Design a protein with these regions (language model features):
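Thiamine diphosphate
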Residues: 1-117
Length: 117
């Protein structure tokens, strides 16, 4: 599914250069083709998920369509305040894409589990 997402996103960015993928230090090799062909459309925000959401809302205000991609539990649980206050309350259009729901990242320990999603 991740490979399909990356291929589909590549096609979308090719048609619409206002789409920007923000990653929280995950999936870097998955998006090599995007980084190579559209370097301005990929941003690795590091392990700073709340900052990624705030950055994305700023981009949305400037007519970009940011897509935030990271492990589900970090995307939601670490960033809930920014999602609510920056994106939802201010009606900023951002897209959240979580990967590794449930116990998909079981080998990384309980901090990476997302059993409440």
């Amino acid at each position: 599914m991740r490979n399909y997402f990356a291929k589909s996103l590549y096609k979308k960015i090719k048609k619409n250069r206002n789409i920007v993928l923000l990653s929280a230090d995950i999936g870097n090799r998955l998006f090599d083709k995007i980084k190579k062909d559209f370097p301005k459309n990929f941003l690795n925000c590091g392990i700073a998920e709340p900052n990624m959401i705030t950055f994305a809302t700023g981009m949305a205000k400037e007519s970009f369509l940011p897509i935030c991609y990271t492990i589900t539990n970090f995307l939601i649980y670490k960033s809930i305040e920014q999602i609510r206050n920056d994106a939802i309350y201010n009606k900023n259009k951002i897209i959240l894409v979580g990967t590794g729901s449930g116990m998909s990242y079981n080998h990384l320990g309980p901090t990476h589990h997302s059993v409440e999603d």
